[in-house]
Amino acid sequence: MQDFWQAAAAQLERELTPQQFKTWIKPLAPVAFDEETHALRIAAPNRFKLDWVKSQFSGRITALACEYWEAQVSVQFVLDPAASGRAAAYMQPAQPGMGAGGMDRMDHHAAPGTGMGGYPGAQPAQTMGGQAPFAMPGQPAQPGYGEYPTAAAYGLGQPQYGHPTGNPAGMPSAAPVPAGARGQGMGQHPGQHHPQHNAELGEIDVVQMDPAEASARSYRAPQQGQHPHAAMGNGAAQMPGHQPSDTVHERSRLNPILTFDNFVTGKANQLARAAAIQVANNPGKSYNPLYLYGGVGLGKTHLIHSIGNHMLMENPRARIRYIHAEQYVSDVVKAYQRKAFDEFKRYYHSLDLLLIDDIQFFSGKNRTQEEFFYAFEALIANRAQVIITSDTYPKEITGIDDRLISRFDSGLTVAIEPPELEMRVAILMKKAAAENVNVPEEVAFFVAKHLRSNVRELEGALRKILAFSNFHGKDITIEVTREALKDLLTVQNRQISVENIQKTCADFYNIKVADMYSKKRPANIARPRQIAMYLAKELTQKSLPEIGELFGGRDHTTVLHAVRKIADERSKDAQLNHELHVLEQTLKG
């Protein structure tokens, strides 16, 4: 067993970045191997590492075990706080040919398409610790900017966290924590345990905390049919059918799969990503609040989950909450119904990081806006980080109190634009690699050229292509892709015509449709006309001469000039890029 783990660790060290190996693989230790059942048990020192290794590396470790023993091996990951101490004994350099079977050949057997041992998202060039520091456009790179913390920052002997499951609106009560205690374990004492209760379902989270804090956290939410005030006390009742689990990500509602590592970066989102990394490394100190806006499926949610996951890696005790705006509204309503606003406030006002998605859903919800205003003020005063996403710029949101709008504007506001062609291709290739499927580059370019709006549309198209290829037993080619997406491409081509583009642009820029064909050259007419030509080239299959004919019989060189000019300006002008995105979304319905 020791020989296996030495060889497996050596192989994983070759496949991973130094930071990934040091953080996730080095603390593991094999516990036992059953020769009869071929069952292998591997221990992790704390719950956070256990959950992450199971989700990200279990497949590769299982494959290495099967290859080593040349049999079907089942791998079980278990929790053992002493694992790190024993792990060092297994981390000696592996000797060539020491495997029981084919282990000495493992570095030739990484799963195709991943380049990183068979699991998605593990690419050295994209890891924060392995790439050049990020700098905001126009600024020099900052020392240490964009780096992951050292392995020591992940902490050994971390507490085990329990959390409720199946309850997205759960609100465990918590006492406010002084700003000085944040980032240092939030005032928790390693020897003190206390049940942390879920304010919606009455479920329990087992956490470690300071005795003084424990006395302030005695609220237990009522079960259904129970009077709100009957829940006070330290009891441990639970809703029937709900058992507490112990994944820190579920308690924070973070998706552990969404990280900076597997976030594809391009011109459209590089500023947002750089700002997100800066916030993740310095929460509450810069860019507070961070406000990200853009259309659906552009990566806003992925980015804010990445921030939360990075903070959890630095400090697993951090109080983090990801919540959609509609769920926050629901929390406010339930707190009102149960007369539990004190507990509601204690929880939300004591967070270290609040990630709230799609804030535009607060529109018209006056009581929710009032409660969020108080929470926002409390968090900022405590130097906690607030991150907000929306589909539009703060001042363009309707039905939101001016006080909130001014708070949203007080930090850093960054747009995430639709991905450019190269980025769309990169996204498709990375998604395909995650599925262990080889998609030819020309196919990725074909799909990216025809589908421009957002990442979800690209993912949906890729799934259709893969399913069509599997069902019909055909290799993925442009012809197969065209057949798989024929309905989608037909709908797009049918909906978008040059005439429709001209009308939409004329309405958007408040000119007459007739101006699209005229010879008038004032800037307020020529500019929209050039934009319409650009969109006609991008969104239809018309040739340059055909487009020129539809714009009053203009020469194809005039159309080409307009297309090149708008394309160049789009890459430099955020406002123009935003306008074009709005027009594209309008035309695509």
From Swiss-Prot:
Annotated spans, Disordered: 108-143, 156-197, 214-249
Ranges where the record places region Domain II: 73-252
GO biological process: DNA replication initiation; regulation of DNA replication
Keyword match Nucleotide-binding: yes
Residues annotated to bind ATP: 297, 299-301
Source taxon at top rank: Bacteria
Principal location: cytoplasm
GO cellular component: cytoplasm; plasma membrane
Region entry Domain IV, binds dsDNA, spans: 470-589
Subcellular location: Cytoplasm
Residue ranges, annotated region (Domain I, interacts with DnaA modulators): 1-73
Family label: Belongs to the DnaA family.
Subunit structure: Oligomerizes as a right-handed, spiral filament on DNA at oriC.
Function recorded in the entry: Plays an essential role in the initiation and regulation of chromosomal replication. ATP-DnaA binds to the origin of replication (oriC) to initiate formation of the DNA replication initiation complex once per cell cycle. Binds the DnaA box (a 9 base pair repeat at the origin) and separates the double-stranded (ds)DNA. Forms a right-handed helical filament on oriC DNA; dsDNA binds to the exterior of the filament while single-stranded (ss)DNA is stabiized in the filament's interior.
Name this polypeptide is given: Chromosomal replication initiator protein DnaA
Organism of provenance: Cupriavidus taiwanensis (strain DSM 17343 / BCRC 17206 / CCUG 44338 / CIP 107171 / LMG 19424 / R1) (Ralstonia taiwanensis (strain LMG 19424))
Lineage: Bacteria, Pseudomonadati, Pseudomonadota, Betaproteobacteria, Burkholderiales
